Amino acid sequence: MIVAGVGCRRNTSAPDIEAAVRAALARSGLAADALDAIATTASKHDEAGIETAAARLGVAVVLVSEAELEAAGERTQTRSERVLALTGVPSVAEAAALAAAGPSARLISPRLVIGSATCALAASEAAP
């Protein structure tokens, strides 16, 4: 299972989010059809850009609770002091990817920033 964790500023466009996801996949040598889901914080439940990007990529959006983000936050590789102050986790993208991919997940692509979107990839043996 491959999950793209996404973080973004409010009203980030679907093309910007999709570009970040595709760049993370390319950096990892993966095609778009390897992706099983996009994960983000539950506070982004109404973010149209994320929903549209997921639809274009043919995957579901997994909303991750604050508690799940915090639990996965210990396994992140990168750190943004700004994001930590706002959300309580060092990287929303990395924590969301890890949380959605499951307890045995590992990061295969740390947080990548493209414009106002960030994307990280996590992999696990879990079924999507």
List PLM regions with ranges:
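Conserved mixed alpha/beta catalytic, RNA-binding, or beta-rich assembly cores of soluble enzyme
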Residues: 1-36, 40-42, 122-128
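A short linear-motif detector with a strong N-terminal bias
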Residues: 16-19, 40-41, 85-87, 97-100
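Alpha-helical scaffold segments in soluble metabolic enzymes
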Residues: 23, 52, 94-98
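Long, charge-dense
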Residues: 31, 41, 45-92
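C-terminal edge-of-domain segments
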Residues: 94-97, 101-128
